[in-house]
Amino acid sequence: MSINWLTHPFEELSNLKHSLDETLKNWTEPAPTAATSMDWGWKPRMDVCENKDYYKIILELPSFNKDEIEVQVNGRFLSIKGQKIEHTTDEWKYHRRERYSGGEFHRAVALPEGIDGSSIQAKFQSGVLLLLIPKTGGKTSQHISLFGREEHGNKRNVIDLEEKERKRRMEESDPMLGRRWGTGRSLFSGSKLNNQNDTMYRKPSASDLRLVKQMETKERERRIRDTKGETEKKKNALKVSRYIKSLGMNPRSTLRRGGREMEKIIHLEERERQARIRDKGRMRQQQALAKKVSNLIKHSGGAARLRHTGFNYSTITKGYNTNKTKFDRFGKENDSFGGFNINKSFTNQFKGFGKNSGGKSINITTGGFKAPSQFNKFTHNLEEKERQRRLNDKKGQNDAKRLAAEISHMIGNAHF
């Protein structure tokens, strides 16, 4: 057995006594629970106590930082985990090593039913982890954040700064909040205002209150005026609506009957209406003339015969050429129409009809009118009238379009 020269004999005896005490303690304690069986690795020292409202758990975790510890509640079990990297060097040779040197540990504690995991308070300070667990019911799973004394102080400073900034912004938007801020700050931050600060807040409160009352009075008067103005607008709009309804189907022309622009527009509309009336009369005349020409062409036997005569000469030469009989332009007997005489004396011969007349000639005297020349002139006059009608119709349509465009332009520029 090797003896360590750095170890004192009485210290060795003390270590042996400690080992015997731990062994006897394990024999006298009950069997390990499920929570104890869940532990592994290095086991930090832990105390568990309670009062009527809380459970308190204290663990000794020397040389640990709060970032290396994880506390979590899962159902009835409180889980505490930690891991620390072991740093070993070859420069030093250890003769005794009792301090925690690194690795991973896990402690689990079984708690009664109804633990409020969301309300657990954790504090880590000077290598000691303190957990306060309320006995009331709550969430069954919760991750607990740890704050040491230094972290608590820093967070308190941050909260105070945030409250001051919020106070400044609120007072800028509403001066009346200057007095009420003291009560709100004492509630939020947990600190009470001293007399000096209270006096500072009390001084501008009276003037701020007067200012707020004046602003509220002005706002109320403005709303009253606004409501009154809206009522007047509604009444005027109702009057205008009733008046416009009484004007009939065309209220725009009635509203400004005496204006120059309206009179000019009315005059142009009247001209356009008269032009439409004249155009309709002209169209009726043109339709009658076109029907007349159409009937003439239809009864003449075609356009080829219109160039020579308006009737069938073969019918005349077969029994009616011996008497002085008057024929109309359709080859029928008619004394009322401008006729012509048929005699034996021939002044004009039409050899083109010799075959149809059996070799005889036809003489048309000057007592009526010569069928070929006079009838062609009559037809030509009708065709010329039809052509002029069409030209006039196009001209009238162009005039009507120009007049309508002028009316539309003037209506667009008119102010009603």
From Swiss-Prot:
<dbReference type="InterPro" id="IPR008978">
    <property type="entry name" value="HSP20-like_chaperone"/>
</dbReference>
<dbReference type="Pfam" id="PF00011">
    <property type="entry name" value="HSP20"/>
</dbReference>
<feature type="region of interest" description="Disordered">
    <location>
        <begin position="216"/>
        <end position="235"/>
    </location>
</feature>
<dbReference type="GO" id="GO:0005829">
    <property type="term" value="C:cytosol"/>
</dbReference>
<protein>
    <recommendedName>
        <fullName>Heat shock protein DDB_G0280215</fullName>
    </recommendedName>
</protein>
<dbReference type="InterPro" id="IPR031107">
    <property type="entry name" value="Small_HSP"/>
</dbReference>
<comment type="similarity">
    <text>Belongs to the small heat shock protein (HSP20) family.</text>
</comment>
<keyword id="KW-0346">Stress response</keyword>
<dbReference type="InterPro" id="IPR002068">
    <property type="entry name" value="A-crystallin/Hsp20_dom"/>
</dbReference>
<feature type="domain" description="sHSP">
    <location>
        <begin position="37"/>
        <end position="150"/>
    </location>
</feature>
